[in-house]
Amino acid sequence: MVPGPNTLFVLKNSVSSGMKGGYLAACGVFIGDAVLMFLAWAGVATLIKTTPILFNIVRYLGAFYLLYLESKILYATLKGKNNEAKSDEPQYGAIFKRALILSLTNPKAILFYVSFFVQFIDVNAPHTGISFFILATTLELVSFCYLSFLIISGAFVTQYIRTKKKLAKVGNSLIGLMFVGFAARLATLQS
């Protein structure tokens, strides 16, 4: 697993909204990844990869969405808003939705799933759906373990950061700037 925008988003939400926020972000990532895996199996992801206009649309949507997330993070940091966990449900719904959109607009994930499944699934074999399902389930389980480690670590860090407001602001600013870097890299990604 290479850390990317999805990983960073899950970690950021586990720090700012606790384990519940982290797991809601992870659920958005899991569902987005499952959709991308299905699209890879169905051939849609290959179509996106081989059609420059479609690839560019997904790529720029992803880059703009990362910039949008970055602007929200930096705005909250500059306004001095408290990023401690809140109990209001609309925040949690927004976390899930943002994670899902972030996952679905990640062309690097599309490229990964297209190239990954081609290596392990013989399209000429009968019942490719079963092979696909086993491989997709394995990937999701590995992702769950990895993201759970980040969520638990993030919740642990939250306890430390709550007493250090300046450190929390610096951390949020760095995460926002990393989203800018991911957006720039995504905008220059080639299919």
Swiss-Prot record:
InterPro entries from the UniProt entry: LeuE-type
Catalytic activities: L-leucine(in) + H(+)(out) = L-leucine(out) + H(+)(in)
UniProt subcellular location: Cell inner membrane
Name of a matching Pfam family: LysE
Chief place of localization: membrane
Gene name linked to the record: leuE
Domain of life: Bacteria
A Gene Ontology term for the protein's cellular component: plasma membrane
Cysteines paired by S-S bonds: none
Protein function: Exporter of leucine.
Transmembrane segments: 28-48, 50-70, 101-121, 132-152, 167-187
Stated family: Belongs to the Rht family.
GO biological process: L-leucine transport
Name by which UniProt lists this protein: Putative leucine efflux protein
Bilayer topology term: Multi-pass membrane protein
Keywords: Amino-acid transport, Antiport, Cell inner membrane, Cell membrane, Membrane, Transmembrane, Transmembrane helix, Transport
GO molecular function annotation: antiporter activity; L-leucine transmembrane transporter activity
